[in-house]
Amino acid sequence: PRSGARASGAKGGHVLEQDLDASRGFRNVVEKTRFQAERIAREALDGGLPVTILRPSLIVGDSLTGEIDRLEGPYLLVTLMLHAPSDLRIPMPGPGDVKLNLVPIDFVVDAGLHIASLPSSVGETFHLVDPKPLTTRRIFELIAARTGRQPPRGFVPAGWATTLMRTPGLERFANIPRTFLEHLLTDVVYDDRQARRALEGAGITCP
């Protein structure tokens, strides 16, 4: 089954593929449901069902066409940038030095199908992630340059940003879910050594 890197909950720092620890709690219901789903899958494995768990990070559009099937996550912040006045420099939520792990859907599909076809993958968990993610500030600088907009200027302190997004009605106004905002503020590295080993020789890498 497809779980998600968010099954690790509020844990920051280095997250191993076999980690499934709820001791740090969850920042939102998405993380909690990912954790619960993976726990159910692991119980099924203990019961004899052949299970391979795939944990992609934040999934974005096709790496060649950019096509997406829904507007969510980073695309909402891009939309906010595009609809702002062209000379307005929107501040970053947080200092912008957190690395945002994004993976294109075609990589997730190709890698997932290959790994799931390997008999040795049964009982294992694999992070499908970008091994060299960019910082949030660099990502939005590139978006600004590509769209002719002003790059982000300054930042809103992390505590202020999350508090503001808890204000009733403000999340809807900004159209940026708090769950995505929390990604921009959590410094985490997803270890993917098992996934890289499984993909060796297959010609499948995160672009």
Annotate the PLM regions.
Residues 1-32, 50-52:
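Conserved Rossmann-fold NAD(P)-dependent oxidoreductase catalytic core, especially the SDR/UDP-sugar
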